[in-house]
């Protein structure tokens, strides 16, 4: 089975779980401008990473905790993801078709 088929099989087998995790993550406010929900959001991410076998380090600062996660694979190659989990303020709320932190599928 090739990589694409393996990935498709994994995603199909874990679709409901993946959707639930994504909904939990995007439901958490993490507005950097207000420093609101950033610690809680980082805790969700840390939990998701640990669940998948990553060794996680958290570096606190005065804005949003920095999360560094590492998991050794079978090869000596490195894959790096660099991302952010904070968002911009959702206002004005009346311009939204649905609540900004309530996922809809």
Residue ranges of predicted features:
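N-terminal capping segment at the start of a domain
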Residues: 2-36
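A short linear-motif detector with a strong N-terminal bias
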Residues: 3-5, 11-12, 46-50, 59-60, ...
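A non-catalytic alpha/beta surface segment that caps or lines the substrate-entry region
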Residues: 31-77, 97-103
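Active-site metal-coordination/substrate-binding segment of hydrolases
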Residues: 78-105
């Amino acid at each position: 089975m090739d990589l694409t088929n393996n990935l498709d099989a994994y995603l199909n087998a874990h679709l409901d779980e993946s959707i639930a995790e994504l909904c939990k993550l995007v439901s958490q406010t993490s507005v950097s401008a207000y420093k609101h929900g950033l610690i809680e959001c980082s805790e969700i991410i840390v939990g998701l990473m640990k669940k998948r076998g990553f060794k996680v380090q958290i570096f606190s600062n005065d804005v949003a905790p920095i999360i560094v996660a590492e998991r050794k694979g079978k090869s000596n190659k490195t894959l790096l993801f660099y991302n952010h989990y904070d968002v911009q303020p959702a206002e004005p709320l009346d311009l939204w078709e649905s609540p900004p932190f309530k996922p809809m599928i």
